[in-house]
């Protein structure tokens, strides 16, 4: 979890509100519980857990938006500038519902619901 604290610090340094799930809910909460909370509170899920993208596809959900890191190095020192750029560039998509996949070579944006 410590590297997530580094992400939260990076987001806050760029005036982006961020909170780790451990401050909100149970550590062992099911993914659908986290997704429901994020949808209801209009938060974007930032994760390296591929299950959130799968849940979006299976449920045809229109929210919440998910930013998914698909790379071995998930540290903000490696991806921070890319993620901050994505948050700024795709802000309107994230507000209306999107799955954004970040990796070392290319970033993909898919509008929700996924088909």
Name these PLM-found stretches:
Residues 1-44:
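N-terminal first-folded block
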Residues 10-14, 33-35, 59-62, 82, ...:
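Short, glycine/charged-enriched secondary-structure capping and boundary segments
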Residues 25-33, 50, 74-78:
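Residues at secondary-structure transition points
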Residues 53-87:
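Mid-chain, well-packed structural core segment of small domains
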Residues 89-115:
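Charged phosphate-binding loop/patch that engages nucleotide di/tri-phosphates or the phosphate backbone
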Residues 21-24, 69, 102-104:
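Conserved beta-strand termini and adjacent loop/short-helix elements that scaffold enzyme active sites
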Residues 39-56:
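Acidic, metal-binding active-site segment of PIN/NYN-like and related structure-specific nucleases
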